[in-house]
Amino acid sequence: MMVAATFLDVFVMNKPSIHIAMPCYDSVKIHTMISMLKIVKELTMAGLKFELNTMKSPYVAYARNILTARFLQRDEDYLLFVDSDLEFEPECVLKMLIAQKDIMCTPYRVKTNDPASTKYTVSIEDPKNVKILQGGLVEINNGPAGMMLIKRTVFEKLIKDYPEKEIKVHPNEDTFPKDLRIYNFWDCNFKDGTWTGEDIYFCDLARQSGFKIYANIDSTLIHHGSFGYKGKYGDSFKPKTNGTNGTKN
C-alpha cells in the first residue's frame, strides 16, 4: 500500500494539520521511534503540516493535560496521542484521518503476565451485537488514548461545557508559559468501587458533551513491555483460537 500517495489523494484539497503528542515516563521505546520516523516521512511526503510534542512525567493524566494545552495554543486541526511504548504502521494513522471522526482510537492489547491474553480496554454498548461500519470502524463507549486522534473542535466544546475544569494552580507552574491554559480533561476516577484511567474519564466527558467515539479495528499495534503484545482489535470479534501472540523483547 502506497500510504504517501493515499495521503495525497485524500487530503490534497484541505490538508489537515496534526499535532502529535507523546507522554513519556522516562524513555521512548526504539520500536516507537522507528514508527514515528515512518509516519513523519509519510506526512512530509504528503505535504501535511505536523509537529511532535513530548511531555516527561510519571503521571500520564497530567502529561496529557499539558500536551492538550500546548496543542490548543497552536492552530492544528487534530491532536494525535501516541504513547511511547506503541509500535505501529503509518496506515493506522491514515485510517483514522480518513474516517474524519471527532474522536477515534486504535485499540491495543493490554500488557499482562500472560502473553497469550488478548484483552483490550474498550467498552462497547452491546458487545454481543457489534455493528462494524464502513472502513473498519466500530462505535464504542470508551477506549485507550495511547493511539487516539481528536479534532480541535472537541476541546473547544469541552472548554465551553466545562469551564470549571480549568486548572488554576498546578505543580511546576513556573516551568510553563503564563498564558498556558490547562484543563483537567484527563483524570483518573474512582466511583462505586471501580477505578478507571484518564482515557475513560475523557471519553465519558466527551460523550456527555454529545460526541461519539469510534475505534479502528483493522490496524495491528504492538504494545511493548517485557513482551511485545501484538494484536488487531478486529480479531477479538472472530472465533477464539489457541495460540500465543506475545514475543519476548
State where each predicted segment sits:
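Conserved catalytic core of nucleotide-sugar-dependent glycosyltransferases
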Residues: 68, 89-187
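Residue-level detector of anion-binding/catalytic polar loops
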Residues: 49, 85, 102, 212, ...
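Residue-level recognition of beta-strand->loop/alpha-helix junctions
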Residues: 54-56, 107, 217
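Active-site nucleotide-sugar/metal-binding loop of Leloir-type enzymes
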Residues: 65-78
